[in-house]
Amino acid sequence: MTQINSQYRLRSSAFERSEEEKLVEPKKVVFLSVEGDETERTYFTHLSETLDSSIIHIEVLRHRRGDGYSDPIYVIELLQEFLDMRQGPLIPNEILNEIIAKYSDETIQTYLATPDKLDHRLKNNIQSDLLLLGIDVEYRRYLQKYDKATDIFGVVLDRDCGSHSREAMEASVKYCQEKGFHCYVSNPCFEFWLLLHLCDVMTEFEDEERRQLLLNPTISAHHTQVSFEVSKRAHHRKRISQAVFMAKYYPNIEMAIRRSQNFALHFPELFDNLGTNIPELLEEIKFPTA
């Protein structure tokens, strides 16, 4: 079976069945499709770990490694793919027909219902062929376990005026609003939200320095202006370790929310000004503040 340029992107290289077995089903799940595969994902994953898992869980949707997700359209499409999968079959019909043609209907139905009844090699072959077609069955099975009317669906986007036009961002936000998705945007980028945990941007930066934060030029092989300011205070690059999250970010979330009040918080102001509406997400999950 040859690999195809699949429209299906939901994929987790980190998924382990042991995690599924230990799962405590929460009353509400926040499903997030995020632009960055490291910074946003690790931040929200660590944040979720601090919450009462019987009440709420943040699930950051995973995509195929190597997929480009710097475009808001792709971020939104990943969330839409998840919702289509949640409301439909585990394997899309066009993929199901192709895999049945190779293995037989009986074999595939057994694989879907009681996979452990199949020969180990046969099961692995089916799984590998599905992955080639863009279908990570185990991850999809894991995601389908969450299905509450109270669940929240959102995208986390960077304004990034150097890459995304205002018109494209306006269209993305409008689409999300029409679909009932929450749209969390930081201008210029998610790292601005991180910076609010680490310092008082309004008092520590002069007007011209804040303008440079908004423009967010690339200043080295590893950093833009904002990511550099984050790195020199928190001492990490893209991936946030749990130790760094607990030391630098978690204790300062309430402070970051307060500091965000000095900047743009809502649309349309967020399109053109330094700011973030990530505090809306913290309000949705009822993050404890004084």
Placement of each model-derived feature along the sequence:
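Short, hydrophobic/glycine-enriched beta-strand segments
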Residues: 30-35
